[in-house]
A protein has these predicted regions:
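Conserved glycine-rich beta-strand-loop-beta hairpin in the small C-terminal domain of fold type I
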Residues: 90, 133-136, 153-159, 178-182
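Bilobed periplasmic-binding protein-like "clamshell/Venus-flytrap" ligand-binding domains
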Residues: 114-120, 180-188
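Cytochrome P450 core scaffold surrounding the K-helix E-X-X-R motif
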Residues: 147-152
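Active-site donor-binding acidic/aromatic loop of nucleotide-activated sugar
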Residues: 161-163
Length: 188
């Protein structure tokens, strides 16, 4: 991004380069949970989470909301059909490089060390016939806190972090204060 920005500007071009993103989904206690879960599945795990507008952080307002969200989402993440793009029914393919796979799994390792609950673990995924492929399974982390690298950094992979703010104002402040704010969805 920085290279493209500098080259474009040096050549008199108008350039907008967003060099990092952390998109949030706020889920209020009165949200239609089925709708929020379905939206999270596509937004977090589509394209193996490797797109700039992927949702990578869910701010479920209140513990009851977070519990309901995680309880409904976890089985869907576990059921993701992962494989090569040309296989029938595949919902998620590999990440782009071996380095990306190692980096993503390193973030999951660090999140676990920092105290996040690994509800669904996508590390170490091996698919028959593609044992050396760059596959990372859908990962769901709960009880993530704002100081954890899995929240602070852009992971760019199929990892969804759930935080548990206790009010809309607290959730809103998390979005506002995040270094990589980009897009936010609110379910209410």
């Amino acid at each position: 991004g920085k290279y493209i920005y500098s080259r474009g500007c040096a050549n008199g071009k108008r350039v907008q380069a967003l060099c990092g993103a952390k998109n949030h989904m706020i889920i209020m206690p009165d949200a239609d949970m089925d709708q929020a879960v379905d939206a999270a599945m596509g937004a977090a795990y589509g394209s193996a989470g490797e797109r700039c507008m992927a949702i990578s952080a869910v701010l479920a307002v209140g513990d009851d909301t977070a519990d309901r969200f995680v309880e409904q989402l976890a089985p869907k993440v576990r059921a993701l059909k992962i494989g090569q793009f040309d296989e029938p029914g595949v919902e998620m393919g590999p990440v782009i490089t071996a380095e990306s796979k190692a980096r993503i799994e390193g973030y999951i390792d660090q999140g676990e060390k920092d105290g996040a609950d690994v509800v669904v673990d996508g590390r170490g995924l091996k698919l028959q016939g593609y044992e050396d492929g760059f596959f990372v399974g859908g990962t769901l982390l709960d009880r993530v806190t704002p100081d954890m690298s899995v929240y602070r950094d852009e992971i760019f992979g199929p990892v969804l972090s759930v935080l548990r703010p206790q009010s809309y104002d607290e959730a809103r402040q998390l979005v506002i204060n995040h270094e990589y704010g980009n897009g936010t969805a609110i379910f209410t």
